[in-house]
Regions:
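Nucleotide/phosphate-binding sheet-loop regions of phosphoryl- and nucleotidyl-transfer enzymes
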Residues: 1-278
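Single conserved hydrophobic/aromatic residue that forms the stacking wall/gate
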Residues: 276, 281-287
Length: 287
């Protein structure tokens, strides 16, 4: 049985296996649209995870790392490299849309050494350390279940110490201090264990966390309200990162091929630039 599909191997008809997001990413890839490349770990892998007592089999793990190897070739970067690391996002993707119910991790692949190489490669140390502190917070919350409120408190304390109001006013040295404090929160909650530095360990932890999120309280309530069977499971989409916080030419947004309110055909959406985010400090998720 095949548990992992590159986007180019799937299509829109494979929703039950690849989930809605994975099937649509595959379809867009095959249409030749400029989609950041990646792969999908199937809903059957999620079912197998639960059948095996919440463990990922060696077979599935090997397929995941084989897919990472193929993604490395496409991106021209190495996963776990400290000079020019391949960074990925890890997202859930059930066959039925469940917005906001399950978890996402961004910037996976960064560590204490890779962030320095990433800073040099991008010539943007502030961006690199901003990405790393976001990753530590997401990974700690989603994978290790360290509540994000601990990290938000640290951010507020640092801003108060510095006399600033917005996260975007923190400079690179401030963000390095934030990384140090975030890692201490992680260590304190993990009985002295340090934040994981191995990219492969990070990835497997994230995949397991997405599978687990299928059964988190929010997801269970949502499934009951929307008649979504509990045995469907969720797929996991691993995708090369695109950054919304890289600089003034970056941003974030959403687009639709129909009007979401009326169903009328046409391109609809909204976006916001990083310049605007810096000026107005919105809660929009940077991806």
């Amino acid at each position: 049985m095949k548990y992992v599909y590159a986007f180019k191997e799937g299509n829109a008809s494979m929703r039950n296996l690849l989930g809605g997001k994975g099937a649509n990413l595959a379809e867009m890839t095959n249409l030749g649209l400029p989609i950041p490349q990646g792969f999908t770990v199937t809903t059957e892998a999620c079912t197998e995870y639960y059948n095996c007592g919440k463990k990922i089999s060696k077979e599935i793990e090997e397929e995941i790392f084989k897919a990472i190897g193929e993604l490395e070739k496409i991106q021209g970067k190495k996963f776990g490299d400290n000079e020019d690391p391949l960074l990925v996002s890890v997202r859930s993707g059930a066959r039925a849309s469940m917005p906001g119910m399950m978890d996402t991790i961004l910037n996976l692949g960064l560590n204490d050494e890779a962030v320095e190489g990433f800073a040099k490669k991008t010539n943007n140390p502030r961006f690199a350390y901003d990405s790393y502190r976001r990753f530590i917070q997401m990974y700690s919350d989603v994978v290790m279940e360290v509540n994000k409120s601990f990290f938000e408190k640290i951010i507020d304390e640092l801003k108060e110490e510095l006399g600033v109001h917005y996260d975007t006013e923190l400079n690179v040295d401030d963000l390095k201090e934030l990384v140090k404090r975030f890692k201490k929160i992680y260590s304190d909650h993990m009985n002295g264990e340090e934040f994981p530095q191995d990219a492969r360990e990070q990835l497997m932890g994230a995949v397991k966390a997405v599978f687990r999120s299928w059964d988190n309280p929010r997801a269970i309530v949502y499934r009951r309200m929307n008649d979504i069977p509990g045995d469907w499971g969720t797929a996991v989409n691993v995708q090369a990162m695109v950054f919304g916080n890289m600089g003034d030419t970056s941003g974030t947004g959403v687009a639709f091929t129909r009007n979401p309110s009326t169903g009328e055909k046409g391109i609809y959406g909204e976006s916001v630039s990083y310049t605007h985010l810096r000026a107005h400090e919105t809660s929009l998720h940077l991806v």
